Amino acid sequence: MKGGRDLKAARGGADRPLAPAYAPCRPGRLQRHLLSGEFDQLRDFPIFESNFVQVTRFGEVANKVTMGVAASSPALELPDLLLLAGPDKENGHLQLLGLFPLQFVQLFVHDESRQQLKVKFRTGRAFYLQLRSPPETRDCEFGRWVRLLYRLRFHSPTCAVPFTHEDTAPEEEEEEEEEEEEEEVKEGQLQPPEFQATEARLDPQVSELWGL
């Protein structure tokens, strides 16, 4: 994170006592999809997921996205993987579009008032996601993402900070935007070239998981 600023307290309870990142609950769409048998090695991963709509930097809606974070081992205290899924264009069924090590991704709180997150790869490619959930649970659900953000920010054992607030200085943001390429969340565009040796785009028809 550039600028080294302290994270601001965010709406949704980021300053509350930390709860377990993966509270037991009814599996979401992504979890149920993984339980369907397509991806046997992901069946038992603890996953925290939400439904979003992808929006442009200016708030225009692009498409629907389900995003989740998962721990690749029960021994891990915090998640180390990011999963992205979306509806199949032909039948509308959920398909897994990509799985990425969190060390290669940054997740920002882009706009708290609109419950928007920003996902950015090290290549500079980025996209914006706005939480899509019932109004009566939206604040609580976004608050869980913020609390997870804080856990990852302050409990990370490495120097990498995968989750943080997007509160860089104006001149730094201008420089960042010049390097940033806004990304559309769809299959075929979710694999930053420099990570091809260490991560794999997951074809929903194939059960190969790059060694997990």
Swiss-Prot record:
Keywords annotated in UniProt: Golgi apparatus
Gene Ontology cellular component list: Golgi apparatus; sperm head
Cross-referenced Pfam families: GARIL_Rab2_bd
Gene Ontology BP term (one): single fertilization
Acidic residues bias (residue ranges): 169-185
Tissue-level expression: Expressed in testis (at protein level).
Family that this chain belongs to: Belongs to the GARIN family.
Self-association state and partner proteins as the record states: Interacts (via N-terminus) with RAB2B (in GTP-bound form).
Function: RAB2B effector protein which promotes cytosolic DNA-induced innate immune responses. Regulates IFN responses against DNA viruses by regulating the CGAS-STING signaling axis.
Name of the featured protein: Golgi-associated RAB2 interactor protein 5A
